[in-house]
């Protein structure tokens, strides 16, 4: 990060008892809070050997965050010291009270005594230590103050101490009305475990340079790794505005403001803050100090590059391309190969919407490896794998490519990209219909949630990769009928990624989709229809597809067909093959319901060709089952059984519970249809086998509470029991069928004319 620009003008004003000592080139201010820290350090030196080793260790661990963090109320500071050493907390309070209630000369004498800490052959504090540097900064800042500023500091210290006394008086009154132990426990938890409250930060006055840098680095790290622990967007922006009010040339504050605006998708504010960041970076001369005149060009080209990245993030690809052209021009003039490689990567993102840019990606990966840019090379490999997956490349080749990128990750300790790689493997296995492998990859990533601890003490477990994996995990559980487990995962997602966080849209979409599937299974089409609007807001293609499914279920065939045709054309244009195949299967079902069975066959063959071309095994298996159902309707059940044995295994191994139930129902239908030419004994055996398959289908369908399909299975099973003369079993199935039939609306179509 660039160094902070210091004010070059004298400002005698003082806010909240804070003296602006940086007018003399000092990078720190003297505040009442820092006076309290100085008293703590003084008393710590006096205590010496009286403190045991455990207390001293606790105090040493406490000092660094106290020195680096923002100012805090005296009550909060006192609570923190009491946790480590109660006796020392009392000494600090008494010493501070003597200074605050004494005369001005007492404060003068206190600072004179601090200088003695460095005297002698074996001083109490070394000048180059963390505490020594802090003491020297404070002594120097205090010595540079005028008499009026010293007096203002003294009155501010009195007010600081008085506010603590008032708060203690209020707390004592409250404790008379409440349980003492409960209140103490509550105060310790609230005061010490949680970050500073907004009102405490806002009243602490301007931060020193080191405090500001610590605050910015902490918040930036939290935004990247654990957004829930960072300040809210409004609170953080308020704090940043306060920082910029006292130092408008603080470049890093502008950059954090840019990141904060991205959280709420504010295009104008994020662009404004990004431009201000690079303006201030050039004004401070930080780049030019180390790189000469080249520093200015470096800032300009990276400013254009970051602006292009911002436009890509919001989908403004034309503006992004213009910014990239500017960055490329300046980078070529300066012969900056690193910047050019970053430009090439973003050029791929901006142009992949127009044409296949795999050539650009391959070139970018090769160049990045040549110039020793493992992070960029790995990202390129992962983008290339994603494009190849959508293009239908074999899974083994994609996994080999990801294995090569994983070698780069582990070699260079790129833990963030390791998470992304595992999340990508999960998504690829889901795309290819291998739910078992996807589940294994998801569990692998979840077990690595403590891979790297960042400096603020949080784990890198709130990134986009974890959000993606948890969403897939929730959907996998829902597909297997474990809705309670899926709800728990979604609940955890909501806690980890609140609605205002940048990755919240992921779980919102999956939550809506799971609710939609449950409503459709339960026959509550009006509820499913109400969920379509929410899905459409998050993903227009998914929303349009589910709207067509609802229309089809409500027997609005014409409207559903029009919508599916419109969606089919759009998905073919954007090359969304997965949705194209799903749409073709839905169109074929519309033809079945309309008794146009021969017209459905070419549609299904087209879907089968697509699914095999793009290696979508699960969709291919589902398409074969639909083709088998078409042949059953056309009167060739013997051939259907041969096809089913080929297609049913992938479905039973990796399919959703609903699809397993429908597949077993189809097997039973084919077994019954093929008994026409059987002898009486062989026919009875075939019907018994069909009943067993229907029982298995019932078990699957009951798991997902699919009442419509369950009703059809019960009807079919009752007919078979009637044929076999099993009256008691027939009556039981008939009773269950009647209960479901009264609850659900009838389609008005023959039972045999629906596969799912």
UniProtKB/Swiss-Prot annotation:
What's in the keyword line of the UniProt record?
Cell cycle, Cell division, Cytoplasm, Cytoskeleton, Mitosis, Nucleus, Phosphoprotein, Repeat, TPR repeat, Ubl conjugation pathway
Could you tell me which pathway this protein works in? Protein modification; protein ubiquitination
Check the record and name the SUPFAM superfamilies matching this protein.
TPR-like
Q: Which domain of life is it from?
A: Eukaryota
Q: Which InterPro entries match?
A: Apc5 (IPR037679), Apc5_dom (IPR026000), Apc5_N (IPR048968), TPR-like_helical_dom_sf (IPR011990)
Coarse class of the primary localization is nucleus
Spans of repeat TPR: 301-334, 522-555, 581-614, 678-711
Where would you find this protein in the cell? Nucleus; Cytoplasm, Cytoskeleton, Spindle
- Name any GO cellular component annotation: spindle
Keyword DNA-binding appears in the UniProt entry: no
- Which CDD domains did the record assign? Apc5_N (cd16270)
One GO term under biological process is: protein K11-linked ubiquitination
> What is the role of this chain?
Component of the anaphase promoting complex/cyclosome (APC/C), a cell cycle-regulated E3 ubiquitin ligase that controls progression through mitosis and the G1 phase of the cell cycle. The APC/C complex acts by mediating ubiquitination and subsequent degradation of target proteins: it mainly mediates the formation of 'Lys-11'-linked polyubiquitin chains and, to a lower extent, the formation of 'Lys-48'- and 'Lys-63'-linked polyubiquitin chains. The APC/C complex catalyzes assembly of branched 'Lys-11'-/'Lys-48'-linked branched ubiquitin chains on target proteins.
Listed name of the protein:
Anaphase-promoting complex subunit 5
* Species in which this protein is naturally found: Gallus gallus
């Amino acid at each position: 990060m660039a160094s902070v620009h210091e004010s070059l003008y004298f400002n005698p004003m003082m806010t909240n008892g804070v003296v602006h000592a940086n007018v003399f080139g000092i990078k720190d201010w003297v505040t009442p809070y820092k006076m309290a820290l100085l008293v703590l350090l003084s008393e710590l030196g006096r205590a010496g050997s009286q403190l045991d080793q455990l207390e001293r260790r606790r105090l040493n661990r406490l000092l660094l965050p106290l020195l680096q963090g923002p100012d805090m109320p005296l009550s909060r500071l006192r609570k923190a010291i009491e946790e480590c050493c109660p006796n020392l907390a009392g000494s600090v309070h008494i010493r501070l009270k003597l200074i605050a209630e004494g005369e001005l000369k007492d404060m003068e004498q206190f600072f004179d005594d601090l200088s003695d800490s460095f005297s002698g052959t074996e001083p109490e504090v070394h000048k180059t230590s963390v505490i020594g540097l802090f003491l020297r900064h404070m002594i120097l800042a205090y010595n540079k103050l005028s008499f009026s500023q010293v007096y203002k500091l003294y009155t501010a210290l009195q007010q600081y101490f008085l506010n603590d006394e008032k708060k203690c008086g209020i707390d004592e009154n409250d404790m008379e009305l409440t349980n003492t132990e409960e209140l103490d426990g509550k105060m310790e938890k609230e005061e010490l475990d949680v970050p500073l409250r907004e009102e405490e930060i806002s009243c602490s006055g301007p931060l020193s340079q080191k405090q500001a840098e610590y605050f910015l680095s902490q918040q930036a790290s939290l935004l990247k790794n654990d957004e829930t622990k960072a300040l809210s967007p409004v609170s953080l922006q308020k704090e940043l505005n306060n920082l910029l009010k006292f130092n408008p040339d603080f470049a890093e504050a502008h950059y954090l403001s840019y990141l904060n605006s991205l959280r709420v998708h504010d295009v104008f504010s994020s662009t404004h803050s990004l431009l201000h960041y690079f303006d201030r970076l050039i004004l401070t001369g930080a780049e030019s100090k180390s790189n000469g005149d080249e520093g200015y060009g470096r800032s300009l080209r990276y400013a254009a590059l970051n602006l292009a990245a911002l436009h890509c993030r919001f989908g403004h690809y034309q503006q992004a391309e213009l910014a990239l052209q500017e960055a490329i021009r300046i980078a070529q003039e300066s012969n900056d190969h690193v910047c050019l490689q970053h430009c090439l990567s973003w050029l791929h993102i901006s142009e992949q919407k127009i044409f296949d840019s795999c050539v650009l990606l391959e070139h970018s990966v090769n160049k990045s490896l040549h110039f020793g840019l493992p992070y960029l090379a790995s990202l390129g490999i992962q983008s290339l794998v994603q494009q190849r997956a959508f293009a239908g490349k074999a899974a083994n080749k994609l996994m080999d490519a990801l294995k090569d990128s994983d070698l780069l990750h582990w070699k260079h300790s790129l833990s963030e990209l390791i998470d992304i790689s595992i999340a990508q493997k999960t998504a690829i296995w889901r795309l290819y219909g291998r739910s078992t492998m996807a589940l294994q990859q998801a569990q692998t990533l979840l077990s690595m949630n403590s891979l790297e601890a960042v400096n603020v003490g949080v784990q890198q477990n709130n990134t986009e990769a974890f959000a993606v994996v948890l969403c897939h995990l929730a959907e996998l559980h829902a597909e297997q009928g474990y809705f309670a487990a899926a709800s728990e995962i979604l609940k955890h997602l909501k806690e980890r990624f609140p609605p205002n966080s940048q990755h919240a849209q992921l779980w919102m979409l999956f939550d809506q989709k799971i609710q939609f599937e449950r409503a459709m299974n339960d026959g509550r089409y009006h509820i499913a229809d109400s969920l379509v609007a929410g899905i459409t807001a998050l993903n227009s293609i998914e929303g349009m597809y589910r709207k067509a499914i609802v229309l089809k279920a409500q027997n609005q065939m014409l409207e559903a067909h029009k919508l599916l045709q419109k969606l089919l054309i759009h998905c073919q244009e954007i090359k969304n093959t997965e949705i194209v195949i799903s749409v073709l299967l839905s169109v074929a079902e519309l033809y079945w319901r309309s008794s146009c069975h021969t017209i459905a066959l070419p549609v299904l063959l087209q879907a089968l060709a697509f699914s095999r071309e793009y290696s979508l095994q699960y969709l291919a298996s589902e398409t074969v089952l639909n083709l088998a159902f078409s042949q059953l309707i056309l009167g060739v059940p013997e051939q259907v059984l041969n096809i089913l044995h080929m297609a049913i295994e992938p479905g039973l191994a990796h399919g959703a519970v609903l699809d397993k139930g429908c597949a077993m129902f189809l097997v039973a239908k084919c077994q019954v249809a093929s008994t026409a030419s059987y002898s009486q004994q062989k026919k009875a055996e075939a019907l018994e086998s069909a009943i067993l398959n229907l029982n298995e289908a019932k078990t699957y369908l009951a798991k997902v509470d699919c009442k419509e399909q369950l009703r059809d299975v019960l009807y079919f099973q009752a007919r078979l029991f009637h044929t076999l003369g099993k009256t008691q079993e027939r009556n039981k199935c008939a009773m269950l069928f009647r209960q479901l039939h009264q609850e659900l609306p009838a389609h008005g179509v023959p039972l045999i004319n629906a596969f799912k």
